[in-house]
Amino acid sequence: ASFGRYSNPATWGWENWFMDYGKSGGCITDLHVHDIDIARYLFGEPKSVSCRAVDTNTRYDIVQTVLEYDGLPVMAEGAWSSGQMKFSSCYRVDFEKASVVFEDGKVTVYPDRDPAPYTPKLEGWDGYTNEIAFFSDVVSGKITNERNPASSAAQTIRVIERMKASADAAGKPQCI
């Protein structure tokens, strides 16, 4: 599996908040964290992480991570790089009988055999709108957040901290 998010440096935040590493945590904590979170959601807790990073604007602005799951490497990449780059995200996950790819805002399923590759209908699907609606329902008390409890978010941040330790050690794997 591989995941990626790319953007120009987030200079549009209030008082340049995103570019202040002490406030935002940089790309590794603000952008890359989403792919680490979904990897944990899909595959569970990694055994170890290895991370390489480049500092361009703040700290850890271009990040490449390998999460190790009992011999299965899951890769993730995140970058605040070129000032001209528009935001994009992508993923590829290989399952037992198909691969699923998300790129250019479209999901495509590639079965091992028949049928031919196809794009599933995802009516009413918009990640941002659904995320905001879910958050609003939790905050208003309409639903209980069992999908992504605070303990899971905290564990993702612990993984990010191990990734920083790995990046600071030139990619040396760190146990989780």
Indicate residue ranges for each PLM-predicted region.
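NAD(P)-dinucleotide binding in Rossmann-like oxidoreductases
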Residues: A53-A133
